[in-house]
């Protein structure tokens, strides 16, 4: 086969593998338990959407990436972004260790020598997150993180509409080294100028400041949305 034919078949194979991974994840017993636990969580009144990324609920393939280029994907939702030329990073899916963890899996990011100026993990939200979304909605994020040592961590919601992207930034506070920190932050879409009729993409960035020689474990991450209360 010629090079062009090989490239086309490779693209088809990658798309097929992604579809098969999603199918296997949906049928995974742990993923089923994770979805049931998410449905049972008490969330604000009027919650009309809740979601946990697949890499928290079921096993993905491959399980990890070492020395990733910026923009490298892990699973079909997560990506790592950085400007570190040495790429001394490892991002991998791990099993959560505690029986009380709602998600059976998490992500672990190990950082060795880091000379870059930024490092983040991005999570793409599904298309369902945009159905009926308005500026009267609040998007709620709950995370559980374990940091090897203290560092500043930020959550940034990005809303792409037409040629524009609106950003909402929240700092995750009270992060201590060696301890699991449960965090809840809310993004009020009233503070954006998003065009509700031109929504194209929504994604979340977890941004790590000065991450050199450290590790971060993400043991929980889920999002939900509800309407702002009327006064």
Where are these predicted regions, by residue range?
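Activation corresponds to long, low-complexity, non-globular regions
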Residues: 1-86, 227-231
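Short carbohydrate-recognition loop motifs
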Residues: 98-119
């Amino acid at each position: 086969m010629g090079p062009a034919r090989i490239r086309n078949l490779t693209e088809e194979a990658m798309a097929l593998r992604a579809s098969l991974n999603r199918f296997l994840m949906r049928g995974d017993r742990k993923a089923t338990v994770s979805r049931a636990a998410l449905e049972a969580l008490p969330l604000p009144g009027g919650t009309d959407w809740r979601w946990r990324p697949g890499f928290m609920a079921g096993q993905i393939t491959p399980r990890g990436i070492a020395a990733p280029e910026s923009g490298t994907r892990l699973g079909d939702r997560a990506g790592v972004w950085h400007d570190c030329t040495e790429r001394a990073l490892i991002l991998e899916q791990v099993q959560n260790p505690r029986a009380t963890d709602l998600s059976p899996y998490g992500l672990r990011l190990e950082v060795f020598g880091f000379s870059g100026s930024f490092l983040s993990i991005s999570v793409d939200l599904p298309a369902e997150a945009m159905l009926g979304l308005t500026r009267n909605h609040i998007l709620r994020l709950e995370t559980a993180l374990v940091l090897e040592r203290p560092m500043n961590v930020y959550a940034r919601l990005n809303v792409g509409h037409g040629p524009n992207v609106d950003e909402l930034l929240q700092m995750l506070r009270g992060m201590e080294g060696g301890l699991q920190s449960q965090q809840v932050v809310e993004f009020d879409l009233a503070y954006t100028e998003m065009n509700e009729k031109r929504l194209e993409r929504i994604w979340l960035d977890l941004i790590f400041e000065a991450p050199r020689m450290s590790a971060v474990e993400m043991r929980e991450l889920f999002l939900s949305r509800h309407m702002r209360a009327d006064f």
